[in-house]
């Protein structure tokens, strides 16, 4: 039974090699499918090697007979294949041996491991003309770096707007114009109140006071009234100045708000053009037709480039 099992495994390996040799002369997609089949056969062969070695060790310990029949079945006659195919398939043989080596190295962790990078390299080597034909530069598509730069610019502008709005909302930027306007208004109101609270006339009875003393008191009250009049004028001027500053600040804030709203709307419109849908619309450089490029195709182009 052990000899029969070993002969069966070696026959499977021979069939895989035969499929590999027979698929060398196939052009185009058939060569690609043949290469993938050869890789899968090599993977199965590599997966069956540890079991075969264990059974061979037990067989040698039990009966030291030479497995001549299995060696005869496992050896492949080179005369059965034409020499041209042998010479043309040397590069792909080495690549498939690399696949088998990778499979044998990864058997300890995974049983169904296939190195996709090596398969992609084999496919790129086998069909360079197809790859050159499908190059995105020939189709007239724009460089994807332009899209990335536009997206980065829009994101940077949005981040700057967010940081400025956060700074103003958190109170880090002090508005000195508003503070000065409030101070002017408060000072003007206080001056007007003080000028009307302080009495201007003399409250002393003229019958109890001498004439010269009464004249002196009247002069002092007149001087005080003049100062109070100046305080009223200064208070009114400060109130007017504070009102003008507040109105200017209000107009400036409305103008800045309108500019911010327009910039925000423009940036959101650009971001909607870039990220609003699953399809990018790009104009070709040769004609005015539009091409729709999905996200999956964009990733494929990035991998190929």
Swiss-Prot record:
Transmembrane segments: 178-198, 232-252
Main location: membrane
Location relative to the cell: Lysosome membrane; Cytoplasmic vesicle, Autophagosome membrane
Residue ranges of the region described as Disordered: 52-88, 123-143
Disulfide bridge positions per record: none
GO biological process: general adaptation syndrome, behavioral process; macroautophagy
Function comment: Plays an essential role in autophagy. TMEM74-induced autophagy may involve PI3K signal transduction.
PANTHER family: TRANSMEMBRANE PROTEIN 74
The protein's name: Transmembrane protein 74
Protein species of origin: Homo sapiens (Human)
Name of the gene encoding the protein in the UniProt record: TMEM74
């Amino acid at each position: 039974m052990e000899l029969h099992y070993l002969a069966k495994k070696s026959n499977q390996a021979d069939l895989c090699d035969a499929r590999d040799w027979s698929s060398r002369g196939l052009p185009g997609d058939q060569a690609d499918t043949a290469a993938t089949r050869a890789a899968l056969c090599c993977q199965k062969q590599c997966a069956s090697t540890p079991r075969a070695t264990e059974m061979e060790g037990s067989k040698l310990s039990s009966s030291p007979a030479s497995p001549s029949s299995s060696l005869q079945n496992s050896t492949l006659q080179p005369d059965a294949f034409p020499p041209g195919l042998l010479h043309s398939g040397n590069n792909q043989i080495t690549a498939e041996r690399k696949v088998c080596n990778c499979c044998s190295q990864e058997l300890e962790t995974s049983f169904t491991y296939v190195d996709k990078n090596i398969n992609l390299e084999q496919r790129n080597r086998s069909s360079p003309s197809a790859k050159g034909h499908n190059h995105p530069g020939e189709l007239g598509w724009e460089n994807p770096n332009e899209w990335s730069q536009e997206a980065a610019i829009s994101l940077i502008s949005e981040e700057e707007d967010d940081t400025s709005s956060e700074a103003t909302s958190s109170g880090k930027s002090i508005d000195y114009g508003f503070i000065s306007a409030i101070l002017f208004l408060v000072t003007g109101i206080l001056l007007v109140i003080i000028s009307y609270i302080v009495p201007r006339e003399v409250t002393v009875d003229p019958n109890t006071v001498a004439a010269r003393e009464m004249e002196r008191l009247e002069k002092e009250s007149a001087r005080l009234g003049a100062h109070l009049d100046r305080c009223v004028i200064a208070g009114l001027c400060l109130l007017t100045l504070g009102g003008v500053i507040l109105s200017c600040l209000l107009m400036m804030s409305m103008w800045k708000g309108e500019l911010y709203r327009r910039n925000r709307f423009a940036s959101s419109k650009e971001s909607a053009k870039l990220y609003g849908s699953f399809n990018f619309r790009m104009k070709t450089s040769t004609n005015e037709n539009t091409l729709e490029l999905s996200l999956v195709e964009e990733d494929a182009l990035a991998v190929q480039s």
